[in-house]
Amino acid sequence: MYEYAVVGKGLIGSAAARYLSQWSDAVALIGPDEPSGNWSAHEGVFGSHYDQGRITRCMDGSLAWALWATRSIAQYPEIEAQSGIRFHYRTGGVQVGFTTKDPNSNLNRAERTALQLGTAYDKYSSAAFRQRYPQYHFGDGLTVLHETGEAGYINPRSLVQAQVKIAEMQGANIVRETVMEIDTGGSAVTLRTDGGQTMRARRVLVAAGAWTEFLTGAKLGLVPTPRTIVMAQIDAAEAARLQNMPTIIWYEGVNNPDIEGVYILPPIQYPDGNTYIKLGGALFAIDYPQSASELNQWFRGSGSAVEARALEYELRRVIPGLRTESVQAKTCVVTNRVDANGVDVGVPLIAPIGAGNVMVAAAGCGAAAKSSNEIGRLAALQLHRMR
């Protein structure tokens, strides 16, 4: 019997398993590897961390998110050193928004948390930023906060690999299968996988992302939200021209009728050997999946054509004259969380469910990749302290 089992081998689950395996020699981390080949033929679960680039930054309008990010980023060097796997790339990052004295604007709140936490940044008008970085254009009359230091992006695939490797080095058993059933009817929790295995654990952490509610059967207020991302392939010459590109988050002042805003990553080489600029945003009109099968169907598809067109338009507006080899759309899912009144909570859920020997850690709210180590640590600590 395991003392701890973590269900979900993603960013939060792998981080939690790394911490739990420091405290116990009876830990299992259960979750499938990334599907190979064409996603359209895959019948199992998916993970939005199957990617090469996620923005990492400390500046955030929420002090909680800023703290989780700051604490996670502080652990990146140790995780890279212990695993021998690099995943953190310092490119700097910008956030663009309204120039206003309103203390509750996104940028003003982000600037306050940066000052509280000692985050290094420079502040520009959009016109002044364009003079320094002429490749990138935002709307007139906006403010740009340019975070330096550790800001940039992480490779989420590599971060998961690093966390899993360290957990395994510390004695955790890695079970590369999908948990299909969680049975709490006994002195321990019984887990059954698609590979036919049955495992028992005293305490279980479910970190299954968008599938968490479907797997546990608990009503947790999780809202799996489909997103479309765009991958713009560029050649070596264009990548060289944009080699100083920071990550970009621009929501205030975009004024696009279809999407709320846009985030853009710098050129990154992907496993197919090509270099892409990845971007995403938030479509206003969303059809939410109501079941695990609908969620799987979304991942197997090609996303929203409306969202893809809007994203490509914004990319070419931010980087005028961008030369692309191809532009393709892919699917992603963000797991948000609402309270009993349907109001967006904006932070992850880390809480026990049922009889108390099962916990969940879910709802990354589209911002958890960079902060996943700290979120996983907090979940592991709470599970460890459960009695």
Where are these regions (language model features)?
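Short hydrophobic core segments
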Residues: 5-7, 30, 198-212, 376
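Active-site substrate-recognition segment that forms the wall
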Residues: 18-23, 84-90, 198, 203, ...
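Glycine-rich FAD pyrophosphate-binding loop
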Residues: 22-48
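Dinucleotide-binding Rossmann-like beta1-alpha1 core, especially the glycine-rich loop
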Residues: 51-132, 261
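Flavin (FAD/FMN) cofactor-binding and adjacent substrate-gating region
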Residues: 78, 98-171, 175-176, 181-187
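Glycine-rich phosphate/pyrophosphate-binding beta-alpha loops
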Residues: 153, 358-372
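Internal hydrophobic alpha-helix adjacent to the cofactor/substrate pocket in enzyme cavities
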Residues: 373-387
